[in-house]
Amino acid sequence: MADTAAARLNMVESQVRPADVTDVRLHDAMRDLAREQFVPPTKAYLAYADIEVEYAPGRALLKPRDVAKLLQAVRPMPGEQALAIVAPYAAAMLEHLGLTVTRLEEGDLSQPSPGSYDVIVCEGAVGRVPAGWLEVLARGGRLGVIERDGPVGKACVYVRAEDGIGRREAFDATPPVMAGFAAEHGFAFE
């Protein structure tokens, strides 16, 4: 699309705002960031569509609606430390919002380097959240991820409190499950 600024505005107005994303900071970030820079040039025309866009084998950007809802659910604040796991667009949005972002795109994605993060997000679905992600979540920290073990996944927010970790479901989503992160099914009598 020749006029990407208009495409970004249309994306926010037709996909993000109608999906109850009310955080104006997220609207502004999505209007400012060129989403087509996060996908191969051959897929740039899909960057603002209401679909997941594959940017590398087995890796896809979430739908604009879903990434905005996920980020709104984790309530990022300027100055916080964030970890973006296979989430290049979300990482750029978090940086735009004033967070310090560590990106994890390669290696053992289930075991981030030791640290303490206020916000953790992943743009790929997982069958189950790896324990390593929860271990690096700071007290009061929020992890936003889509858990999927079937046709429809649930965007979940995990919050670390003093006495443990809580979980709540935020919305339904259907991104592909990342390679190596499918739910393990055991034997069961039917």
Predicted regions and their residues:
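Class I SAM-dependent transferase core
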Residues: 1-105, 163-183, 188-189
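Conserved nucleotide-cofactor-binding alpha/beta core module
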Residues: 71, 75-165, 169
